[in-house]
Swiss-Prot record:
Potent inhibitor of hemorrhagic activity but also proteolytic activities. Inhibition occurs by formation of a non-covalent complex between this protein and the proteinases at their metalloproteinase domains. GO terms for molecular function: cysteine-type endopeptidase inhibitor activity. SUPFAM superfamilies: Cystatin/monellin (SSF54403). PROSITE patterns: CYSTATIN_FETUIN_A, FETUIN_2. Disulfide bonds join 28-315, 85-96, 110-129, 143-146, 205-217, 230-253. The lineage of its organism: Eukaryota, Metazoa, Chordata, Craniata, Vertebrata. One of its GO terms (cellular component) is blood microparticle. InterPro entries: Cystatin_dom (IPR000010), Cystatin_Fetuin_A (IPR025760), Cystatin_sf (IPR046350), Kininogen_Fetuin_HRG (IPR050735), Prot_inh_fetuin_CS (IPR001363). This is Antihemorrhagic factor cHLP-A.
């Protein structure tokens, strides 16, 4: 569970109208510094390919870099915490609950550079992040019986998701859903069970066509209540090697108001091949977020590290939630 995932983001936010103050009294706790950090957090959440939105936790470092006089360049390091809102959830991140430590929290450390054009108020944003869950040892030290995070591709997690989805489809008339992404899986104790969170999408198949395996089902586009996010608990033994057949379970699926053309519509396109498992806690590979076509030719700065420019005073800033 100490595996890391690197997330590299590149792009641009147009039309920033915030009035930024870069005075001698700035530190990592001032409103002006947080305004800059909020731009970075918003950009990360809008371009994150899978998993969950992240909330600001700590501004670790904030630097004002030398510029040509036509722009303001800032570089800062952020610590973020995973929320309970999936990236497809339209809820503003400010209204999303941060996943607490007893629920096996996940943090993300990010290097952010923003180039603010003084004349046009346009912001060019470069972000590189690394995500890692809290260690199993820490979770068990503080809460011995709390559920432990599992890889989304763990067989018990996958079987539980498919079992719940089949039960969900059996209750529907004229609608068939398939898994869009497995986002989270946890092993629970007393009673033993598997807790899963996953996104589903409606497809243009009948129930029989979806079962026979010979018909290629295509997901509907976003909008019109075609995408939902589910949370479920399947009560079964970890020692069980068979797929669940008649297990007790609890589930809740909520329709997401995802508009067509949403930034995360790529998930639907990926589904045409096969549903994905979020790599957020299990992969050690870097992956590059697909950028809007208008910005695809821009290059990620090779130097996203610390600079000779000293950071502002009062850093790191205060912890907004908790520190892992």
């Amino acid at each position: 569970m100490n595996s890391l995932v690197a997330l590299v983001l590149l792009g641009q936010i147009i039309g920033s109208t915030l009035s930024f103050q870069l005075g001698p009294n700035m530190d990592c706790n001032t409103k002006g510094t947080k305004d800059w950090a909020d731009i970075g957090v918003r950009y990360i959440n809008e371009h994150k390919l899978d998993g969950y939105k992240n909330a600001l936790n700590i501004i670790k470092i904030f630097r004002l870099l030398p510029s040509d006089g036509r722009s303001v360049i800032v570089h800062f390091k952020l610590n973020l915490l995973e929320t309970k809102c999936h990236v497809l959830d339209p809820t503003p991140v400010e209204n999303c609950a941060v996943r607490q430590q007893h629920n096996h929290a996940v943090e993300m450390d990010c290097n952010v550079r923003i180039i603010h054009d003084i004349a046009t108020f346009e912001d060019e944003v470069f972000v590189k992040c690394k995500s890692t869950p809290d260690s199993v040892e820490n979770v068990r030290r503080n809460c011995p019986k709390c559920p432990i995070l599992l890889p989304p591709n763990d067989p018990h997690v996958v079987d539980s998701v498919e079992y719940v989805l089949n039960k969900h489809n059996e209750k529907l008339s004229g609608h068939v859903y398939e898994v869009l992404e497995i986002s989270r899986g946890q092993h629970k104790y007393e009673p033993e069970a598997f807790y899963v969170e996953f996104a589903i999408v409606e497809v243009n198949c009948t129930a029989q066509e979806a079962r026979d395996g010979h018909h290629q089902c295509h997901p509907y586009t976003a909008g019109e209540d075609h995408i939902a996010f589910c949370r479920a608990t399947v009560f079964r033994s970890h020692a069980s090697l068979e797929k669940p057949k008649d297990e007790n379970f609890e589930s809740d699926c909520v329709i997401l108001d995802v508009k067509e053309g949403h930034a995360h519509s790529h998930l639907i396109q990926q589904h045409i091949e096969k549903y994905s498992t979020s790599p957020g806690h299990n992969s050690t590979d870097e992956y590059v977020v697909e950028c809007p076509v208008a910005f695809v030719e821009k290059e990620v700065p090779t130097d996203m590290s610390d600079h000779d420019t000293p950071p502002v005073k009062g850093c790191p800033g205060r912890v907004l939630h908790f520190q892992l």
